[in-house]
Amino acid sequence: MKLGIVIFPSKMIQDKANGLRKRYDPHYALVPPHITLKAPFEAPEEQLETIVKELRTIANKTNPFTLHVGKVGSFAPVNNVIYFKVEKTPELTFLNEEMHKGFLTQEREYAFVPHLTIAQKLSDAEHADILGRLRMKDFYYEQTIDRFHLLYQLENETWNVHETFHLGKGSK
């Protein structure tokens, strides 16, 4: 089964991102706006319980933290993805690193750059035009993050939450 681990921002941030994603992201209908902690990976269904236990341990070791989202960035020229920048806090870095250790180890395709995708699969001309327009706008949001989610992908390529993990000691 295909799994992924993400943080969902507040509804306000999701609404702002979706206003842009509707027009510029072909994956708009497949998954809500999110910050990827661990890129999609394959795991046999019989390992799911072990993965869930490991994620509970990680959640218990991580305190809630403030997420800062602002400004627009791009991964060009590697690919034409436009995103809201997310400040790389020690907590986000810790979560990402923990999700690539031990049982969850996997080869990373890219360095960890926390972000919220708002446009992708654009032509070079579309990318330049949209990025230029969005960089002129002022975006800044912050919120407390107290959970992350393990997602699984369905046959129709949509993603659903398998389990939510609350941050901090005493979380279940």
From Swiss-Prot:
Coiled-coil regions listed in the entry: none
What keywords were assigned to this record?
Hydrolase
Q: Which SUPFAM superfamilies match?
A: LigT-like
**InterPro entries the record matches:** 2H_phosphoesterase_YjcG-like (IPR050580), Cyclic_Pdiesterase (IPR009097), YjcG (IPR022932)
Chain location of the short sequence motif HXTX 2 per the record: 115-118
Q: Which residues form the active site?
A: 34 (proton donor), 115 (proton acceptor)
A family per Pfam? 2_5_RNA_ligase2
Q: Which residue ranges traverse the bilayer?
A: none
Alphabetized GO MF terms: hydrolase activity, acting on ester bonds
Domain of life according to the entry: Bacteria
Gene3D superfamilies, per this entry?
Cyclic phosphodiesterase
Give the Enzyme Commission number: 3.1.-.-
Please report, in chain numbering, the residue ranges of the motif HXTX 1.
34-37
Family of this protein: Belongs to the 2H phosphoesterase superfamily. YjcG family.
Q: What is this protein called?
A: Putative phosphoesterase Bcer98_0945
Q: Which organism does this sequence originate in?
A: Bacillus cytotoxicus (strain DSM 22905 / CIP 110041 / 391-98 / NVH 391-98)
